[in-house]
């Protein structure tokens, strides 16, 4: 660890950045204390150091900072936040300061928010089902313990509601008491942050939720620190307290915009879409902090939520996120306009690990077959709608008209559910069987006969 060094030769202040001359031994991400002539102190991080100039990113912004009379102290260590199980039920900013008028964290350990590298050979493959209570996720795109599964939303779509509902309802069945949620609100508007807080408090979910919040009007560095602090807490709860932790990060688009703002202030050569060329690597350092570790009982499951600019799934943020994570849940504006909540487009959504965490002994024996059949039948229903728009519904065959009915029931009964409706996996699969029953049995080609005889409404209850 480096010793504390003090400097006073500020060469330039630009946006949230301070350029300090005469620094030859600064470390990347080294914590800095800025003392102004009036005694006010602020904090920052070294984000670059070359040719004797250190660039310091100030947490509280540089407004009011003078190039003369200001002291810069390099503290010889990275940003550390005191972490404790006491943070569950509380709200903090990315620096670990209380935002709920409660006491500071007394008992705890100081941890570097950048985390520790995890040996890939020490990872354990995700295989345990997490029940979110959302049919379109549990039934068709199951979330597994240790997985990273993002939600791609659009401006104005109810991503906040879905995030809050999942945070309230998600659980590992049989281990409910050992489940916690770390909820990171990145660059949130004040009314959104208030919505999350009130919702968790009113529903009682706050007792198992720790909130890490940065607001939209805060400097960009606070937004970049938010997911890192949240995941540092998640790592502590998972790997030292043996808890199953779901980390919900909303909105990762705000994180990437903060990266772009900082990069522009540093006058870096922009990459695709004006974002820094290292954004892929930066996102990977966040998303790869999910997982299970051999020999550890706990786990970290991630659900990053991002807003696709102009609903463009090929935009750099969702595009790069998709490369790193293990699938995606896509919210659809057309479904939202039809009054469907949550407006999940199941045909564009995917959970790459789902097949390993569902079925007999994990959820229910018919889960895989029902999931495959629902996908196939809904895909045909969507194709049939397109055909009906061209030739007219009257020209369709009897079977095609049943697929149209199936498509409508699938959206209204299976995908759509109430904001406070928590469906267990058995209820989800039973609803799937109910809407599949409108199709002839001969069309259920993806389901084994034994499951049709056991679960189909025409046979259920019969000996």
UniProtKB/Swiss-Prot annotation:
Subunit structure: Has multiple subunits with at least A(3), B(3), C, D, E, F, H, I and proteolipid K(x).
Entry GO MF terms: ATP binding; proton-transporting ATP synthase activity, rotational mechanism; proton-transporting ATPase activity, rotational mechanism
Protein family membership: Belongs to the ATPase alpha/beta chains family.
Protein name (database record): A-type ATP synthase subunit B
GO BP term (any one): proton motive force-driven plasma membrane ATP synthesis
Pfam families (alphabetical): ATP-synt_ab (PF00006), ATP-synt_ab_N (PF02874), ATP-synt_VA_C (PF22919)
Coiled coil: none
């Amino acid at each position: 660890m480096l010793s504390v060094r003090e400097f006073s030769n500020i060469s330039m202040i630009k946006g949230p950045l301070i350029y300090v001359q005469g620094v030859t031994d600064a470390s990347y991400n080294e914590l800095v204390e800025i003392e102004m002539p009036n005694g006010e102190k602020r904090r920052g991080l070294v984000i670059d150091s070359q040719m004797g100039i250190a660039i310091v990113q100030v947490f509280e912004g540089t407004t009011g900072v003078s190039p003369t009379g200001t002291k810069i102290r390099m503290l010889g260590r990275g940003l550390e936040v005191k972490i404790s199980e006491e943070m569950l039920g509380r709200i903090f900013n990315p620096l670990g300061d209380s935002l709920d008028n409660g006491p500071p964290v007394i008992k705890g350990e100081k941890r570097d928010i950048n985390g520790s590298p995890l040996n890939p050979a020490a990872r354990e493959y995700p295989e345990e089902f997490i029940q979110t209570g959302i049919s379109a996720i549990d039934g068709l795109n199951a979330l597994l313990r240790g997985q990273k599964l993002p939600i791609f939303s659009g401006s104005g779509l109810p991503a906040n509601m879905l995030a809050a509902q999942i945070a309230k309802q998600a659980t590992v069945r049989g281990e409910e008491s050992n489940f916690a949620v770390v909820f990171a609100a990145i660059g949130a508007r004040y009314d959104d942050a208030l919505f999350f807080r009130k919702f968790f408090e009113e529903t009682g979910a706050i007792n198992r939720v720790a909130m890490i919040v940065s607001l939209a009007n805060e400097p960009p560095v606070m937004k970049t620190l938010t997911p890192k602090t949240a995941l540092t807490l998640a790592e502590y709860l998972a790997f030292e307290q043996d808890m199953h932790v779901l980390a919900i990060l909303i909105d990762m688009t705000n994180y990437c915009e903060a990266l772009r703002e900082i990069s522009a202030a540093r006058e870096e050569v922009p990459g695709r879409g004006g974002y820094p060329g290292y954004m892929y690597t930066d996102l990977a350092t966040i998303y790869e902090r999910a997982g299970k570790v051999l020999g550890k009982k706990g786990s970290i499951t991630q659900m990053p939520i991002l807003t696709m600019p102009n609903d463009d799934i090929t935009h750099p943020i969702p595009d790069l996120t998709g490369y790193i994570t293990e699938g995606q849940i896509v919210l659809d504006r057309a479904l939202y306009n039809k009054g469907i909540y949550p407006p999940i487009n199941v045909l564009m959504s995917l959970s790459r690990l789902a097949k390993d965490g569902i079925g007999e002994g994990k959820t229910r024996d018919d889960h895989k077959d029902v999931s495959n059949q629902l996908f196939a039948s809904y895909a045909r229903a969507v194709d049939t709608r397109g055909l009906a728009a061209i030739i007219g519904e009257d020209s369709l065959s009897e079977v095609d008209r049943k697929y149209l009915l199936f498509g409508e029931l699938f959206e209204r009964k299976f995908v759509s559910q109430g904001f406070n409706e928590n469906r267990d996996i058995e209820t989800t699969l039973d609803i799937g069987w109910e809407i599949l029953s409108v199709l002839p049995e001969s069309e259920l080609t993806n389901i084994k006969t034994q499951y049709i005889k056991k679960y189909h409404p025409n046979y259920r209850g019969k000996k």
